[in-house]
């Protein structure tokens, strides 16, 4: 029997939410710290399934990690060489662990088996494996061609220093390559083949690599140059920003409910691209206040939420939240250039279309777009399937602010990035039923 939670019709209270640490920053930071030549104390690390999978993997690879407090730990770097050259690594459905670890282990070489949950074995990795093979890596598919699970063997340096890679499926492939190639000590040039999607996630990678002492030359997101003799040296202390993707639910709530909501842990100088979500809300009726360590959204009650037609390539995760905001506009809304949704935790375009229809919305799906026309009145007590996708569960919680109760199946899927989400959400609302 699937566990579910019923969210009654609710009113949002003026609120401040302290965000959990960013998933994207947490897992990148853990790996970079593990590969550094010194120790790094990491503060405000996200505690979630995805970071747990990365920590378990690093432990199996022989990395010494001291747990100092619930959200603070010290990683003792390995100097760019994992002590354990043989390991069996289960990585769940954590793309931010699977892709970068694949690249790092392939570049270092050894005898490694990488696998995950069934959905991870449906998420493509062929473009990354192809690029690593050009660099001399031994990457073998143990199941379906171009998909996990993988076996990684010893790398032979073949002298190849120019690595082409496709960027139109997942920016994590480029992130993985960027983080791994400095471990060789050689100069490399990475050349993009076709379009690079989700560029803001590459910005996160490059900014974090710079904090760990490796400066990559970025030539207009077409060519990336890694210097020779690079090595990772960690800052003694590193503070993880709040998760900007997780912020989107609370910021959207402030817009939908015309009630001020402030999120702390991100701000005007955040390195995460998903902070741009607040700027998109501003275009459709929100008042946004930016601080150094907060973003606040509200809306005057007399101002309507506007419809939108948005190219969401720059905010693929936060854009899911806009699919729910569309229900508050009363008019057809469109999200474009979201093809990457198809290969995330689930096929998010199909899943979003299915569940919005349960609420009475008219939805037209395209390969890389979704068109949403809200109904005059939403269907109450719709039972929303979440497809083991944390973002589906968090998005659809907002329906309870639109005047109808909603039932969310498998609410614990939020443990991937935000285990306390439903507790936090209910603390911000008052039941009006």
Curated annotation (Swiss-Prot):
It is an enzyme of class 2 (transferase). One of its GO terms (cellular component) is cytoplasm. CDD domains: EPSP_synthase. Disulfide bonds: none annotated. One of its GO terms (molecular function) is 3-phosphoshikimate 1-carboxyvinyltransferase activity. It catalyses: 3-phosphoshikimate + phosphoenolpyruvate = 5-O-(1-carboxyvinyl)-3-phosphoshikimate + phosphate. 3-phosphoshikimate binds at residues 23-24, 28, 170-172, 198, 317, 344. InterPro entries: Enolpyruvate_Tfrase_dom, Enolpyruvate_Tfrase_sf, EPSP_synthase, EPSP_synthase_CS, RNA3'P_cycl/enolpyr_Trfase_a/b. Belongs to the EPSP synthase family. Catalyzes the transfer of the enolpyruvyl moiety of phosphoenolpyruvate (PEP) to the 5-hydroxyl of shikimate-3-phosphate (S3P) to produce enolpyruvyl shikimate-3-phosphate and inorganic phosphate. This is 3-phosphoshikimate 1-carboxyvinyltransferase. It comes from Neisseria meningitidis serogroup C / serotype 2a (strain ATCC 700532 / DSM 15464 / FAM18). The gene is aroA.
